């Protein structure tokens, strides 16, 4: 359908949704969407973002108010846990997105075969009907570039790093299923594209490709995401969900940040912690690139200053306060000629790096490249095939993994954190356990939830809270930014900036990486790992000079060569 920026294609009139009596998740929302608009939805976890998408998609029927669609528009929806047919292969599922094109090609070939049959070529009326239908199909095929369908599918699957096309869907991980579902949906090209956390399980290169694709997308895009660069590059509107209300803001994320800060200044007599955090993020946004680079270099030389900062002052300033742990010596962790393979798949070979005492190292690269394996090797949970990791004598590691296996599902959030003690000893001071949990967005009621019923984002926040209270001086954080709302991300960034120690963070969140990292350890494909001193943006510039501007490809491995 042709773009029409004056055409309202969808409206919500007085929409409210409550999961419990007197507890509205969405409250009396009035919204209208124009064709071609790009809208990013933000808000705390539990604020109703996914529920709003489900209402628009027609999957959530139990609500008050009215939802009105203009006739003739199609809707496509990417759920956080999409349904895929387990009896099919990856390619068969992806091809569902182009089924009308496949049907047109199939019918075109059938018509060509009919031309050779006597019952058709001996009957002029039937031949005329075939020629007419063939012309109609030819128009469809030409308009959709259907003759190049296989190469288009291959490019899309490569760009999103989908698994091999012949792999059974039943064998895919959760992240692989999402990438396949996203690929199918983008090929489908609905008029309204509803995306629930589209950047989850995508690496930075695939996210960059997705951004460019959506910037050029003719239809309306409505995305729930915590990826602030995605919101900056794609969104023309921000819809903030706050205590049930839907507040629209014109502009991208940086524009929202500026408008939101001004509004909070007018509403608050004294500046809250959250407002100060927003103001500091806005200050970073306004910085010139060279000033940002200088900040990263200054951090590397400020270990003693950070270590000696007054704990009480830091705790009062920060929403998430990370205790420093014991003083680090000059030797932190050093990789010496490390190699690791699974079977004949070489993850990395001759890996060398030295972690700085006050550095924040961002670990980036495609899923399956070996990032989590690196952490498991450092922790001694797996063995290297060659080389060694040397760990300094003063190092005390706090490790946050993706599996969260050490969370007891039968205990409440409060019980897991407190261990039965009302006060936690952190940074040489007593900290109230409930107050500590509230910093990770666990309110009073949420603190009593059993861990077995927590969402992915809640488990991530809980595990982060568990690890950060251990007072390590080296933090290994595996995807701490997954399923975490923007407010918690912002608070975590500030906590890490003020942490006197070394942090190594696996993340695909480019804004997060850009704001806090002093170094980047990049898994670049073909078993190559590149260690770079500088911010994420500086690394990207360096990579462009070294490797050129290529579209993302699926992960490929070299074979392990034995002596």
Segments (PLM) and residue ranges:
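ABC ATP-binding cassette signature C-motif
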Residues: 1-272, 316, 323-563
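Intracellular alpha-helical coupling/juxtamembrane segments of multi-pass membrane proteins
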Residues: 259-292, 296-302, 306-313
